[in-house]
Amino acid sequence: MSRVCYVYILLAGILHTSAQVNFRDSDSKSRQENHRPLQISLSAIEQLSNLSQTSELNEILKHLLVERVVGTQGHENVRNYIVDYMRNLNWHVELDEFVDNTPIFGKLKFANIIATLNPTAERFLVLACHYDSKYFKDQVFIGATDSAVPCAMMLDLANTMQSQLNAKRSDNSLSLQLVFFDGEEAFHQWGPKDSIYGARNLAARWEKENKLKHIDVLLLLDLLGTPDPHFYSYFKNTESWYVQLLSAEERLDQAGHLERYSYSSVTPNQQTVRYFQPHSYHAGIEDDHIPFLQRNIPILHMIPAPFPDCWHKICDDASAVDISTVQNLIKILRVFVSEYMHLNI
């Protein structure tokens, strides 16, 4: 009889705990769906714009603009540089290491880098890119836009916004997470088993660990650094957040904070060129977001259409990068992150 009572009490406790977990999950989902940006003032926009440090950005790029094929010394050096950089900013850094079969090279060891401002937070805005470069037989391919520059942008954002982000470090409701995927590039021919190695592994792992539910939005950066990129809203369920990127660009422009920018209202006689187009576009682009999209994670894809002329060509090196454009995009991201996370600027 006592054993039956014990089982009954234990079962009741489990059911009660399960109900609490389901309630918390439902409550968190509601907060994700109802989350809205907190628009910052023009003086705050100016403050964020003035955080740009071209010398520091160039120093970051110097370490990233090297060949980064998985399994090479250059790849290992870049991985260590990113890890050390984020740890020196006092972020929590985790490596998602795994081995997978590849054509040409057989088994290779991969490592996704996950840097988190506050790992105990309930929800995360995730910025992501890949840090490997494509393999070319008998040629050195740097992959400046693909994706050394996006990596540099994310590192620069974390560095230049230290003060603003540190004030949010103890917030357990919402935090910022930076993911540097490994193995995005195919070794032989793009396909479901020869591409996005890191993204496939991490999405599956986080699904198994029930961590995907903590992601509000995954903003993926790719093929960035050439002048005058055109971006579009690729996914209907994140159109409102795409509009925030577009709005950040417009407000930075109107305040005169974008460099060598030909859409500028300050110099209206120039040819009209804006980065974030007020249009949606079903591009069907395959990238690191796919395993997360398949698991119903909201995606923002900051990738230009059309792709840069140097895409997967040897000319995708430092000479393809326009630093003014890169700084402009970082400024837009600073405003977006600040407004998404309700930072006190």
Name every feature range the model reports, one short phrase each:
Residues 99-102, 119-121, 131-135, 183-187, ...:
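Solvent-exposed loop/turn segments at secondary-structure junctions
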Residues 43-51, 64-74, 100-103, 137-148, ...:
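Second-shell loop/turn segments in exported
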Residues 114-116, 124-128, 177-180, 216-222, ...:
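Structural recognition of the beta-strand scaffold that forms the well-ordered cores
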Residues 217, 224-345:
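Active-site-adjacent substrate-binding region
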Residues 15-75, 117:
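N-terminal hydrophobic or amphipathic helices/low-complexity stretches enriched
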Residues 138-255:
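Acidic/histidine-rich catalytic neighborhood of metal-dependent amide-processing enzymes
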Residues 24, 56-120:
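A non-catalytic alpha/beta surface segment that caps or lines the substrate-entry region
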Residues 2-20:
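Cleavable N-terminal signal peptides of Sec/SRP-targeted secreted and luminal proteins
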